[in-house]
């Protein structure tokens, strides 16, 4: 039965939410009521499937904790006052921590002046952020298109490559097996997981996939496409596959792909949505081997965990296809003042606190610790891998991975699996994680593995 719109109900709901936003603390009854309310609204108005997903990583089989506020730079507090060390990092958005004061202050100061741009007058922060990224990014990258997410940055990269290469008769794209580039139609065409792709077939034509890390397969595909007249417009890669399970390519793979792109006249698009902004121990993962892309995709941590923002940064040669008509590809909220303020502050924090170098140091410490645990528990752990503060623990099967996440939840450490590889648990904390907190995480992992071994033996 269709229901009639109710202004009174909408008004009451919004007023209740505003009252909640004003609160700093909740008493016991308020907490219980909010937990029930949030679960009900997720079930009835968001997506009931999310409840089952959250349920799989909670202690005792109850529904997931309801988030309330940041506890500090590296922790979250739920409505029950429980504090969790964040080793998930919002899937890579909290590189400078939760509510970093420099980022929050920049956004608040801009909010006091003008939160969104007029669309007609020139907005200064967009210009300043574009200039900053031109200075920060490698090679000849010079111009930036701003959007709101990683998926949008990939969409822009695909369109930019198409616009540049279409006059040259090049329309084919090569991505890799295990890749994740987003779930909008264009980005999904480059993504390589059937679960996400199958319901939306047919996707964009002209996308091919080759095994990640296999330079011979890449060379063969480029060559075969040339032979059949399906010349390649661009190769799109993650320097390290994040959702694929934190998969690192062999040393020399990215430089070799760059060389092949030059040989065949294809553009190189690097998707650093997850690996960028210091995550792997360099500002950008491509810098580990001095690889310079034609187009670079950024998002997630670019907004400092305070505002959503994505960026597609390209060389002048490629970006110039938009010069004559800058409205060929636009988005209303892309490059808005609040998002640009957050991004500028984030870059400032990353550089002044040398967080990429900290990520390298702390990442080595955590990786060494996890690898020692893997040696102690070879019956549970297949492999530990990663670079900087992007790490993964691969378990012997999916069930062990789920159980490890639940055990870590009991130890008040948040972790989660990857979208393309269920038995792999990703460790992706803020780069601001302290050495003491690193030790706490390793202790929690040891306890979790010990508990898992007991449960496996009992089963």
From Swiss-Prot:
Modified residues (N6-(pyridoxal phosphate)lysine): 300
Residues the record lists as binding pyridoxal 5'-phosphate: 150-151, 274, 332
Catalysed reaction equations from the record: an alkane-alpha,omega-diamine + 2-oxoglutarate = an omega-aminoaldehyde + L-glutamate; putrescine + 2-oxoglutarate = 1-pyrroline + L-glutamate + H2O; cadaverine + 2-oxoglutarate = 5-aminopentanal + L-glutamate
Record keywords, A-Z: Aminotransferase, Pyridoxal phosphate, Transferase
Keyword DNA-binding tagged: no
Annotated metabolic or biological route of this protein: Amine and polyamine degradation; putrescine degradation; 4-aminobutanal from putrescine (transaminase route): step 1/1
Domain of life: Bacteria
GO terms classed as biological process: L-lysine catabolic process; putrescine catabolic process
Cofactor field: pyridoxal 5'-phosphate
Catalytic class of the enzyme: transferase
Annotated EC: 2.6.1.82, 2.6.1.29
GO molecular function terms noted in the UniProt entry: diamine transaminase activity; identical protein binding; putrescine--2-oxoglutarate transaminase activity; pyridoxal phosphate binding
Function, in words: Catalyzes the aminotransferase reaction from putrescine to 2-oxoglutarate, leading to glutamate and 4-aminobutanal, which spontaneously cyclizes to form 1-pyrroline. This is the first step in one of two pathways for putrescine degradation, where putrescine is converted into 4-aminobutanoate (gamma-aminobutyrate or GABA) via 4-aminobutanal. Also functions as a cadaverine transaminase in a a L-lysine degradation pathway to succinate that proceeds via cadaverine, glutarate and L-2-hydroxyglutarate.
The protein's name: Putrescine aminotransferase
Biological source species: Klebsiella pneumoniae subsp. pneumoniae (strain ATCC 700721 / MGH 78578)
Gene from which this protein is expressed: patA
